[in-house]
Amino acid sequence: MPYNCCLPAMSCRTSCSSRPCVPPSCHGCTLPGACNIPANVGNCNWFCEGSFNGNERETMQFLNDRLASYMEKVRQLERENAELECKIQERNQQQDPLVCPAYQAYFRTIEELQQKILCGKSENGRLVVQIDNAKLAADDFRTKYESELSLRQLVESDLNGLRRILDELTLCKSDLEAQVESLRQELLCLKQNHEEEVNTLRCQLGDRLNVEVDAAPTVDLNRVLNETRCQYEALVETNRREVEEWFTTQTEELNKQVVSSSEQLQSCQAEIIELRRTVNALEIELQAQHSMRNSLENTLAESEARYSSQLSQVQCLITNVESQLGEIRADLERQNQEYQVLLDVKARLECEINTYRGLLESEDCKLPCNPCATTNACDKPIGPCVTNPCVTRSRCGPCNSFGC
């Protein structure tokens, strides 16, 4: 009778489903007693010659015990798995359904706080703008005050210069008045001298007349005196007019010089005021450009800092992703190695199963039909979830051979 016992399908997934995290060093001995397998077990060439060596029964007994322990372990793991599933279901039924807490109130509070923060930021920005405007206005007023102060100093210096010119003109006027007074005194002196000379001449002429009366009178002294007087008066009047004309011309020239100097001074002052206004406007514009440059530099620095922080964050994210990729690749390599080890274990187990099946078939073919052999439940197929009834076999017959 051929051996029809159904063996359980052994694969790396079945043998390792209960231990997914077993280190690779333990994958070579997945079943108890696997490290004590004889050297000839697992070699597919030893039974192909059609003869058995002296350790045939020991090898079959060893494989039978190993298969029994494996099936016992599978049944134990299935029972533990069922118990764990029952416990998980009971735990899920006992636990209350997870209710998500209501965070709407907190969300509203957070939104209100965010609105307040935004309002505060806008208010701070407005205050900063007002402070900047006030600083600019203060700077403008300071520059205007400095310009007006410089203009005042210039006007005061001009007034001091005009006062000096006025003092000089006053001195010139006093000198001219002194000259006029001296000329008048000289005129009076000349008149007095003239009168004295006239009187002396009259006295002399009178004496001579008395002397000459006795002689014969020749000239009219009164007429001569009148002519001389007229000549002197004309000379004095001419000198007076010349002096007055010279004084008038000098005064007019000085007045013209003063007027022209005052006009030039006013034009220079107006030009200076216009230039100072232009300078003030240019200074204000320069300060505005400086403030704009400072604000643009601050904005540029803030933008650079923000983009550098964002770049560092992106770089950190890239580094994290690269590290995660490295870990995933290492994990994939490790899982690939584990998979290869499991494939090797599967191949070795399949080879052992084939060896075991070949031994059983060859033994069944060599042994004569045993009338004591009892048929077991192996006649009907066994599914993958049914335990194998052929694990334990009884010895019977005079040859003490294994039955079905």
From Swiss-Prot:
Keywords: Coiled coil, Intermediate filament, Keratin
GO cellular component: intermediate filament
InterPro entries the record matches: IF_conserved (IPR018039), IF_rod_dom (IPR039008), Keratin_I (IPR002957)
Region (Coil 2): 220-363
Residue ranges of the region described as Coil 1A: 57-91
Annotated signal peptide: none
Tail: region residues: 364-404
Tissues with expression: Expressed strongly in cortex cells in newborn back skin and in the central unit of the lingual filiform papillae.
Region (Linker 1) residue spans: 92-102
GO terms assigned for molecular function: structural molecule activity
Region (Coil 1B), start-end ranges: 103-203
Domain IF rod: 56-367
SUPFAM superfamilies: Intermediate filament protein, coiled coil region (SSF64593), Prefoldin (SSF46579)
Region (Linker 12): 204-219
Site annotation Stutter: residues: A305
Region (Head): 1-56
Additional note from the record: There are two types of hair/microfibrillar keratin, I (acidic) and II (neutral to basic).
Similarity-based family: Belongs to the intermediate filament family.
Protein name: Keratin, type I cuticular Ha3-II
Organism: Mus musculus (Mouse)
High-level lineage: Eukaryota, Metazoa, Chordata, Craniata, Vertebrata
